[in-house]
Regions:
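Conserved SAM-binding loop
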Residues: 30-31, 112
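Tandem CBS (Bateman) regulatory domains
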Residues: 1-4, 18, 38, 43-93, ...
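Short loop/turn microsegments at loop-to-beta-strand junctions
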Residues: 27-28, 93-95
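Long hydrophobic segments that form regular secondary structure
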Residues: 13, 21-28
Length: 133
């Protein structure tokens, strides 16, 4: 259920981040540095708030993003239930999936939508198997 994360660099402007968010129909944008390491995250809510309080064409996302280490993360070997609990407990829409040795190396992301799609697919599959028995 890991998906490709939507990325912008820390020197991108809020206006560019908003456009990127809607182009990819994403819930969040991950902010990376020049070495492609995770620096922060911006949700739709963060971008909306930033657009109300600043000049979006000239304000870098780095000014408004939630920074590491204040970001909830998961590792690729984390089970689905653990990821779901993090999403639910912290009321967030997406988690970055990071490398076990380097928690700034983003590998992908998991969203509430992808997780729910997976659960529904598994439940339907279980129903079909029961009906066939």
């Amino acid at each position: 259920i890991m998906t490709s994360p939507v990325l912008v660099t820390s020197d991108s402007y809020i206006q560019d981040a908003i456009i990127t968010l809607f182009m990819y129909d994403a819930d969040v944008i991950y902010v990376i540095d020049e070495d492609k390491l995770l620096l922060g995250i911006m949700s739709r809510k963060d971008l909306l708030r930033a657009s109300l309080n600043s000049n979006i064409a000239s304000t870098p996302v780095a000014v408004c993003m939630t920074r590491m280490p204040h970001i909830k993360i998961c590792h690729k070997n984390m089970n689905i239930l653990e990821a779901a609990v993090l999403l639910q407990d912290y009321a967030i829409d997406s988690l970055p999936i990071v490398d076990q040795e380097n928690e700034r190396q983003i590998l992908g992301s998991v969203t509430k939508t992808a997780l729910l799609d997976y659960i529904i697919q598994q439940a339907r599959s279980t129903e079909v198997n029961r009906e066939e028995e």
